[in-house]
Amino acid sequence: MDHFLYRDGALYAEDVPVAEIAATVGTPFYLYSTATLLRHFHLFDDALKGMDHLVCYAMKAASNQAILKTLAQAGAGMDVVSQGEYLRAKAAGVPGDRIVFSGVGKTQDEIRTALSGGIRQFNVESEPEMDVINAVALELGVVAPITVRVNPDVDAKTHAKIATGKSENKFGIPIARAREVYARAASLPGLKVIGIDVHIGSQLTELAPFELAYQKVAELTEQLRADGHDIHRLDLGGGLGIPYTRSNDTPPLPVEYGAMVQRTLGHLGCEIEIEPGRLIAGNAGIMVSKVIYVKSGEDRDFLIIDGAMNDLIRPAMYEAYHDIVPVIEPSAGVEQRAYDIVGPVCETGDTFARHRDMPPLEAGDLVAFRSAGAYGAVMASEYNSRPLIPEVLVNGDQFAVIRRRPDFDEMINRDTIPEWL
C-alpha cells in the first residue's frame, strides 16, 4: 500500500495534488510520502515484536537526509556501505551505536571514521578486511565489534545482478570455512566477535531461500557457541521484494517474514537485525515526468518525456518494470494506445517501456513512475550534462524540496581547466 492515489480525477501524494508540486518544482522530480515510509517501517518493526531486534534501514536504497531522519525518529537504525553513507547518517542525527557498516571494500579511512565516530558493528566480508579492522582498532586504542558475513550458497531466485548469496558471488566467506575464520577473528586483540551476518540478495519474492539460509545460520550459531564464541546477534540482511507490477504475484508480507524468522531462529535467543531498504522506500516514492513530444514512428508511437535513464536507471540496467500512470486520471472506458515511453538521452537504452498501454497523451501531460522510491535518485547521474533532479517530501498537506535541482553553472563550474589550455 502507498499514499499515491487518485482523488477527484487527479493523482495525489497524501493530501497534495501531484500537479501542484510539478507546477512549483518543475519536472522531472522524485516525490516521497512520509506516511508510506513510516507505514512500511512499522510493518517490519511490528513483524519482529517479541524478539529483541533492530530494523536497520539499508540507506543505499534512498539516502536523502530527510528520509533518514524520518525513519530514525521512528526508531530505525541504519545500514551503511560507505564513508559517505556513514557521514550522511550521522548528519541526519543517527547515533553511531545504531549504525552497522556493510560492504566488501571498506577502506582504512572508512574504518577509522566509523571507529572514531561510533559504530554498532562491522559486517566483515573477508579475512584481509578483518586484519585491517584489527590494525586500525589497535592504532586507535579501541576494540571493534564485528560479525562475519557468511555466504550460505543459496539461490535467491532474483535478478543475477542483485543476487549475493551464491558461491560465485563476491560477498562473504564460504559458510564451510566459517569456524576457522571465527577462530582467527577471536585471536585478534582489536576485534570483538558478537555475531553472524548473512544477506542473500535483493527483490526476493519467496520465503524459501531466506528460510534455507537462516537454517544454515542457526546450525552455525550452535557450532560457534560450542567452539566458545559469544554469538548473540544475527544480522539477517534485507532483500524482501515489493510488487512492481499489477499481477497477483505479490511478495510475502513482513508479518509472514517475521513469523519465519521466529520459527527458524527464535530458539537461539539472539538479537535480530534486519536491513530492509527497497521494501521501506520503494513504493514510498514516485518519479514525475512531463511529455515533451508524441512522435509517430514507422510501426509505433513514442512518448518522449523529460525524465531519462540518467534520472531512473533501473529499466535500462535491470530491465526493470515500473507502472507508469497519467497524473490526470483517465475517464472510465477510455481507449488505450500502445506507446514506447522513452527519454531524451542519446541512447536506444533510454527506454522505460515498450508497447505500454496508456490513455491518449499529449505534450505537456504529466506521468508518474510508481515504485521509484528505491534505487532511483541514489543511482542518478549527470549523463548528457543533465542536472540531477529534485527530491520532494510530502507530509500530509505540506511538501518540501529536500534536494533542489542544481543550475547549469553549478554543474559546469565543477570542472577545472588546466593552465596549458
Language model features with spans:
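Active-site loop/helix belt of alpha/beta enzymes
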Residues: 152-294, 358, 384-386, 395
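Charged (often Lys/Glu-rich) extended helix/loop segments that serve as interaction or gating elements
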Residues: 260, 269-421
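Active-site-proximal loop/turn and secondary-structure-junction residues that shape catalytic pockets
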Residues: 61-63, 84-85, 105-106, 126-128, ...
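Conserved beta-strand positions in the central sheet of alpha/beta enzyme cores
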Residues: 79-80, 123, 147, 197, ...
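Short acidic, glycine/serine/threonine-rich loops at helix termini
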Residues: 67-68, 91, 111-116, 133-136, ...
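Short beta-strand segments
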Residues: 58, 145-151, 197-199, 235-237, ...
